[in-house]
């Protein structure tokens, strides 16, 4: 079934300029709708780890993008206090008390999750925003005013602190989603965008900005890397001087690495403050 879906969606993507809400074959509409439904249930996901490496299911990302071409904007009620006008309904628009109980997560008003996002058991959504295609795994806290971008992959027992921004793939169009692996802590007002991967058990301090062009400086080795935070890293904001010493530019600094056992025993503040 997935292979047939993929073929229909790949073909539709190649001819996307011909698609509109009023001009789309029935099989394309059905395939895109089914893909979004499976993303919403967590049965399919845009990226998954296989044999230790993250593999992006590009056809599912295409399905998310195609869904915007196939739907018209429509009024959407917002609990009596306002009204929205959009193409993607709320994930919880038709939820009953039984549906919420079966889901096993908390949604604190006015948190928003779009249909096509997956929210696992024991997740807490404080007043925050989770976009279509995102996957938020068990036990994760999405704190107040945090945003989880389209198709972003958030692991188990992650804490996204207040105001954290996790980038999406839709605007601007990105090749790969942001991935935050299990047991990570992302500090307040930090931003992780452009398909950066933060590996498991890492701690990102407050106000750290990570994109594909951000230099990641390892204090222990002196190495500079891009696009990936190694497992167990403790990261703070910093600067690297230019070769001529005339200026410095922003970077992220890996100040230490800890194993999962240390991460579990030691408080976050102690990890960030220690030498």
From Swiss-Prot:
Its EC number is 2.3.1.117. It catalyses: (S)-2,3,4,5-tetrahydrodipicolinate + succinyl-CoA + H2O = (S)-2-succinylamino-6-oxoheptanedioate + CoA. Pathway: Amino-acid biosynthesis; L-lysine biosynthesis via DAP pathway; LL-2,6-diaminopimelate from (S)-tetrahydrodipicolinate (succinylase route): step 1/3. CDD domains: LbH_THP_succinylT. It is found in: Cytoplasm. It holds the Pfam family Hexapep_2. It comes from the Bacteria. Keywords: Acyltransferase, Amino-acid biosynthesis, Cytoplasm, Diaminopimelate biosynthesis, Lysine biosynthesis, Repeat, Transferase. The keyword Acyltransferase applies. Gene3D superfamilies: Hexapeptide repeat proteins, Tetrahydrodipicolinate-N-succinyltransferase, N-terminal domain. InterPro entries: DapD_Trfase_Hexpep_rpt_fam, Hexapep, Hexapep_transf_CS, THP_succinylTrfase_dom1, THP_succinylTrfase_N_sf, Trimer_LpxA-like_sf. One of its GO terms (biological process) is diaminopimelate biosynthetic process. GO terms for cellular component: cytoplasm. GO terms for molecular function: 2,3,4,5-tetrahydropyridine-2,6-dicarboxylate N-succinyltransferase activity; nucleotidyltransferase activity. This is 2,3,4,5-tetrahydropyridine-2,6-dicarboxylate N-succinyltransferase. Belongs to the transferase hexapeptide repeat family. The keyword Transferase applies.
